[in-house]
Amino acid sequence: MSGGELSGTDNARLKDAVQRAEGLSGLKFSLYLGDSGDDPHATALELHGRLVDPANTVLVLCDPQQHALEIVTGAEARRSLTDEECQLAALSMQSNFVAGDLIGGLSHGLAQLGGYARKSRILHVTEG
């Protein structure tokens, strides 16, 4: 996570949001906040590819200067998190960004992604 301009409180909120999303879903989450160069999508793909376990990781890239937001899911993560769910989380984050709440938007978006990817509990009904 790149957060040179973030306060300690903001950094802590984002780290907590990442940990909660991971706890809910069993996936790994990575957040990049900063400059994404000329092509945010290509940058997100490159960053995702450099992660320790890209197959099981969801990368959220946010470049406030370029108004760019990218969500990249690894091959295994994609089994638990659909493109539509990522789009819904992105729309939610963007709504917060427009209202001037970058940290809240990222935190809530990560929570949404973690919730969408939550592993379902299998309930067995005993006939009797």
Where are these regions (language model features)?
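A structural boundary signal for the start of the first folded domain, especially the loop/turn
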Residues: 1-57, 64-128
